[in-house]
């Protein structure tokens, strides 16, 4: 454990004593050889003015779309391994229907009924929390019976009825910032979800349109959104997309994914979203911007240790 980590441990434990248990630090364990990794910290009492000293890291990972049993199980098994290795709680993510594919001929997914069966199986067989997105209000109720987090796609983040339906399920709602909105603009989707009864609302940065077939990330959006929501996620994979740049499909530059994560951390993000695949080049959706599953461990380790 380095000096900064030891100092943080001391500060959190001291604050826990000072506020009679209002701050709670988790343990520090030796996960691999002689390298010690800091576990996440979280404050119980958010009224404590020092709660920003510590950070709750949220990790979300999974294939862009549900493809087949082999891919699903390979990804889920790796997430279980990484959870044990790092003492974290990665949420399994995958879509049952990619309703916003560029081309009509592109693979969309297994559909609502079959997709929810797969996600329920991931929860049961692997013990992972799961997240999926919805595109229509009527999907919220059945999805809410299975998943832990309901995601609102970026293109749909201003759709009031969709947000309200997701919020009414009682599940955590993750709202992705549209490619045409600023961080400050996310105040309004957030307020819609809270007003509809959502107890926990996350906001996700995923870049902004920059001319044709390109996205750029204005990292100032992260602190802007942190002033709105406690938990702000960086979508490290969709932010490297090149929309429509691959002839009827989305292109991307996956080599920038690790840098996106570290830059987001520097700007105060406390969550990280990765679409991953055992063989992204053979993925049925968003292959060029998915992270190779074998590379996820190194990316997470870098986030936790730097």
Locations of regions flagged by a protein language model:
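Conserved N-terminal beta1-alpha1 strand-loop-helix module at the mouth
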Residues: 51-118, 124
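Hydrophobic faces of well-ordered beta-strands that scaffold small-molecule active sites
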Residues: 59-61, 90-94, 130-132, 150-152, ...
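Active-site glycine- and acidic-residue-rich loops that bind
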Residues: 64-77, 176-187, 206-224, 240-259
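N-terminal active-site wall of soluble small-molecule enzyme domains
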Residues: 94-151, 158-162
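Conserved anion-binding
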Residues: 99-102, 156-224
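Active-site-adjacent loop and "lid" segments of alpha/beta metabolic enzymes
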Residues: 104-113, 151-156, 212-216, 239-265, ...
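Alpha-helix-loop-beta-strand connector modules within alpha/beta enzyme cores
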Residues: 107-130, 166, 170-172, 223-230, ...
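Glycine-enriched alpha-helix->loop->beta-strand junction motifs that scaffold or abut catalytic
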Residues: 142-151, 167-173, 194-200, 228-231, ...
């Amino acid at each position: 454990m380095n000096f900064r980590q030891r100092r943080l441990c001391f500060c959190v434990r001291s604050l826990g004593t000072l506020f009679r248990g209002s701050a709670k630090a988790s343990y520090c364990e030796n996960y691999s050889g002689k390298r010690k990794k800091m576990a996440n910290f979280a404050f119980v009492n958010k009224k404590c003015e020092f709660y920003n000293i510590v950070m709750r890291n949220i990790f979300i990972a999974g294939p862009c779309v549900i493809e087949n049993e082999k891919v699903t199980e390979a990804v889920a098994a790796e997430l279980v391994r990484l959870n044990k290795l790092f003492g974290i709680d990665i949420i399994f993510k995958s879509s049952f229907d990619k309703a916003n594919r560029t081309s009509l001929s592109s693979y969309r997914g297994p559909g609502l009924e079959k997709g929810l069966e797969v996600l329920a199986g991931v929860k049961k067989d692997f013990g992972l929390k799961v997240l999926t997105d919805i595109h229509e209000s009527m999907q919220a109720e059945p999805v809410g019976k299975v998943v832990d987090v309901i995601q609102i796609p970026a293109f749909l983040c201003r759709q009031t009825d969709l947000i309200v339906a997701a919020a009414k399920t009682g599940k955590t709602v993750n709202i992705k910032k549209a490619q045409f909105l600023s961080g400050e603009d996310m105040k309004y989707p957030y307020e819609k979800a809270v007003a509809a009864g959502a107890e926990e609302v996350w906001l996700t940065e995923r870049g902004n349109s920059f001319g044709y077939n390109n996205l750029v990330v204005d990292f100032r959006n992260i602190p802007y959104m942190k002033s709105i929501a406690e938990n702000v996620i960086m979508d490290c994979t969709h932010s490297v997309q090149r929309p429509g740049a691959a002839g009827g499909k989305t292109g991307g530059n996956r080599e920038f994914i690790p840098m996106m994560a570290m830059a987001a951390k520097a700007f105060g993000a406390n969550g990280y979203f990765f679409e991953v695949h055992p063989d992204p080049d053979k993925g049925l959706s968003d292959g060029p911007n998915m992270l190779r599953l074998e590379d996820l461990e190194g990316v997470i380790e870098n986030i936790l240790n730097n």
